[in-house]
Amino acid sequence: MTVPGVAPALSQTCDALQAGPSGRVVSISDGDTFDLDTGLTVRLVGIQAPKLPLGRDGFEAWPLGDEAKATIEDLVMGQQVSLYYGGESRDRHGRALAHVMVERDGEVVWVQAEMLRLGLARVYSFPDNRSCLEVLYAAEAQGRADRLGIWRDPYYAIRDGGDHEALLDRTGGYELVEGRVLNAERVGSRVYLNFGRVWREDFTAVIESQGLRVFEQAGIDPLVFDNA
């Protein structure tokens, strides 16, 4: 199928999705999760919005979490939405992992792309759910170029892979990290990308076997990043 974009700049097509169920949105948890009147909980696959505590002890809300939730409410609350699947359709909690379309003012809006374009989410993919990433990254790039939402907040800044002390302070979070890989090494079923000389102390990215299959399908050997 052809997925409509949310603006002319995002008019690329994505032919990998299959139509799923539809329903009316009756409650919203945060900027990427809501419930339908059918009882199905939907997790917007392919993106991650700023997180809220949602009853978790000691969990601090991420900046712009309330704004992301308010935007989703404005987009879909009380509206009939259509779900589309491009990979694994359920997570371990039983939530639908779906791309979501909603009609607004006579036009179909792709909710994930809209949140990215507004700078209220980042692309967030898994090996078993990578459909439409090119279009999603284009939407994210637009939000970043316009410095909207999270892209003007230091909390979401792209981290330096060589600054291991700063990264240590971000343990447990989801970060975008860039830098030079000083060493790439395969050990068993994993590949380690080391951004420092002392792997026990410096930042290291680990590619598990499932992720390595994605690299293989793309024709990329991650070992080429050695000293790159």
Predicted features and spans:
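Small beta-barrel nucleic-acid-binding modules, primarily SNase/OB-fold domains
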Residues: G5-A228
